[in-house]
Amino acid sequence: MCRTTKAVFEKTDVTPAQVTGISFCSQMQGMVLVDEYGRALRRPMSYMDQRASAEFKACQTHGPCVSGVNIGMLLRSLRATHAASTSVKDPLWKYKWVQAHEPEIFQEAHKWLDVKESLIARATSEFVMTRDSAYSTFLYDTRPGHEGWNEGLCQMYGVETRHLAKIIECTDVAGLLTEQAARELGLCPGTRVYGGGGDATLIGVGAGCTAVGSTHIYSGTSGWVGTVMDHQAVDLSAMIAGIVGAEKGKYNYFAEMETAGKCFEWVKDHLVLDEVNIYLSKTDVAESQETVYESLYDYMSDTVAQVASGSGGVIFTPWLHGNRCPFEDPAAAGIFFNIRLETGKAQMLRAVLEGICFHQRWMLECEERKTKTAPVIRFVGGGALSKVTCQMLADITGRTVETVENTKDVGAIGAAMLAAVGSGLFPDLAQAAAHVKVNGRYTPDAALKPVYDRNYRVFRQLYASNKKNYALLNRLKEG
């Protein structure tokens, strides 16, 4: 990050003195324990970490349960937060794991931070947490008049309140850039550092989805469907919650899948590169001037475009690291279903993209139970770089899909928008969002609806049909 920031100034006429503020966007639900100087006491744990299954089970799977959580604990959490920790991957259980397995580090810890907050601490020596990050701990009370850390929930889960940071708004000034941080970043000391936000908060903002009722779909390493609401909602049957947004009074009704683009990366490594005899050694096939492919992903997209919709009946489940919505199961895994002698790699490749889109349709339909999603959806992230995928998403969901400029960087754009609002450049995020430019529009092809609807019906049955087998094969590994 420090090298990149300095490199930016080498490619522009802007000087560090002209930078009036910075903010960060990062992955959420990480766990970073730091000392009083902001130094990490151990390797941070990412949102995908599953090591705390014993802590999760010991704390809240006893007695009568709903969605795998003790009903009393579930109701207390829902009453205060309109959500509950139902996944072993949640940061609360990472915190409890360190408490149980690394007591010396736990006692030395000054604050429990998320990824973005640890960067703010390094940059400013201030220990803060924006509301969206605080909410992702499932300890933040969202009730009017009660906003803040809920001491009752902390006691219930055994969280020490001394570890919790001061809560600020995403557009607040978190602190000023220190001399050391400024030197490392190539910026000026005293530059304002704003609260910023997590990726789940800011990717929608950077996509221009700030108005109530707007919907975006993100496909990066993970994936999600988010719809802006003016009130909180929760659907435990589908594991969807209205998470705190960047603006007070707005919430992102958020349905998440653990692996989206990561599935395409997996297929690139294991089904494509070996085909051209460069297994795991290259990501670019543009060695000769004759090739028309700028990258291997372009090659893969072009290959997919030549395969008929429906992938010859092959269906892929994109659950390579478990799943969260519409079912929470860390043991769930990927399947290539209905492979026959005539099935080729190109069909399997297309099936992966279709499987990701099927799952996104599933989440979109689940959101419709509690809110009205938008008829026109903004599609962002690395997956939106492929016109083939964009059209596929439109065809499978039956919605018009729009893409925006700089789609891989919408999280950073959202962070810049927060800094712009915080500094007074814009009065609110709606004004900033008006500057987000649409660069593509895809309408669904009605002729493809029958084949996609048929495959989608089968796709939705595959988890229920294999749930017991997933548990048999994969939950043994947790022990």
Question: Model-found features: residue ranges?
Answer:
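Glycine-rich phosphate-binding/catalytic subdomain of phosphoryl-transfer
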Residues: 3-291
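Glycine/Thr-rich phosphate-binding loops that ligate phosphate moieties of nucleotide
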Residues: 3, 16, 20-62, 104, ...
